[in-house]
Amino acid sequence: MFGLNSFTSTIEDLLKKDFIFTNFFSNLDRSSICLRHDIDFSVIDAYKVALIEKDMGIRANYFFMLSSNTYNPISSENRSYIEKISKLGHKISLHFDPSIYDDIDTFFIKEKEFFENIFGVTINIVSLHRPRKFLEDNNRKLKGCNHTYEDKFFKNMKYLSDSAGRDIRSDLKYMIPSNQDKPLHLLIHPIWWTTKSSEPSHTLNNWLEKQNDFLISETARNCRTYQK
């Protein structure tokens, strides 16, 4: 929706105002920003944003789904992009969906250990996908692991999100550290910032077209009898 140029200028503006981009376990104050990216659709879009952040000297926190129906994080291409994001200095971790499991704790451990083994990382914080019901029932750690909706990362921080394509640029424009009473927990989904469009549906339709082209190409590559 907003485009990579807009993402760049938004981050540059925050840096000019002396905000400091850091991780969730640093000594946080009102000038701190914990930049979080939940990857719901496109690993390639995540990589595009990660490159810009690297060039601007900041580090972000990227969370990838193992249970996604829209991308496979361990396909050869996606795994390569995720590893590149990590090598750029960003933190990579698990975007866990508690809504798909009856035994949340057991399957959380399975996903966490799988992610750690595949990508060679140690996970100390995860983000939650569709967290509402989980948070209604309890706001607790997952088998001793922190998550981004715990009170210390949510209620005790100013939370700002572009979920569903919400335009948060005006909110960020008027923020300055001296006016903040809490650190900023900033959730940005790369898909809203890598293409230009007038509304969320247009962005998603554009993504769907790319996915369709990709699936046609993969089908032809995997089955020689397929005719486009």
Task: Give a label for each model feature.
Residues M1-N61, M65-S80, S86-G89, S99, ...:
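Terminal accessory/targeting
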